[in-house]
Amino acid sequence: MTVTEHRPWRGVLVATALPLDDNLRVDHGKYAEHCSWLVENGCDGVVPNGSLGEYQVLTPEERAKVVETAVAAIGGTRVMPGVAAYGSAESRRWAEQARDAGCASVMLLPPNAYRADERSVLAHYEEVAGAGVPVVAYNNPIDTKVDLVPELLAKLHGEGYIRAVKEFSGDVRRAYQLAELAPELDLLIGADDVLLELALAGAKGWVAGYPNALPRSCVELYRAAVGGDLGTAKKLYEQLHPLLRWDSKVEFVQAIKLSMDVVGRHGGRCRPPRVPLLPEQEAVIRAATEKAVAAGLA
C-alpha cells in the first residue's frame, strides 16, 4: 500500500532514529538524507519525534526543525510526526505545527503524566483533533500506563477524534475485536516483533523501527505478510526476528542505532539518560545484524 491522499498512515512508516553529531547535536543534514534513503528503499513515509527519535530530550526548537527537515526531504504527505506531550494544549500546539509544516497526519499518545481515566483520554484526543489534522492514536500501555482498549478506541473513532491506531500492547487478539467494534478504524502494527501476526489480522500499516537499518527486507516482509504470501513472509520473519524483537525491549533505541552503524548508516549515540548498551547486548545485536547482512537482507 502506497501513500494515499486520505489515509497517508497506511503502508510502512518508519519511526525514525535521529542522527546526532559528536557533541550530541541534531545533524539535520544526515536526518534529511536518512528520510530520503528510506523512501528510496521502499518505505512509504516517516514518523519523526517518536520515542525512537528521542523526542523527550529535544528542545522545542529542535523538535520543530526535525519535522520541517523531514517535510523538506520527502514531502508532508509522507510525514506523520509524534505530537505527544504532558498536556493536551501542548500536544495540540505540536499538531498545529505539523499541520502548518504540511504534514498530512499526526500520531498521539494518551495523557502520560499520570494514569488518566476514560473521560480524560476522550478530552485529550478531542482537544488535539481540534487542530484539524487527522490523528493516529498510539496505544503503549507499557510505558504510558494508559491502555487504549478496543472499546475505548471505538469511542474515540466514533467521536471522530482518531482515524487509526498504532497498537503496541502486544496482544494480537485485540485486532479482531477492534475490527468488530470499529471496522473503519485502521490498525497499524506498532511493534516489530508481532508484525506477521497483526498483518494476518488485517493491519493496514506498520509504524516500524528496524527499517531504519534494513528497509528493503523489512518492506518485503510487510508486503508479503499483508499480501498473503505466507511462504515469503514466514521465511523473512524468521530471519529478521532476532533483530525485530529488540523493538520491544527497553534498549530499542540503542539497538536499532547499533544495527544502523553495522550496515553503514549513521546510527550513533543517544542523548542521556539513555546509556550505551552492555557489551553482551552489543555482541548479540551486532552478530544478528551481521548475519542479516550476510543473508542479503541489508
Model-derived regions, located:
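Short, flexible micro-motifs
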Residues: 14, 48, 53-56, 85, ...
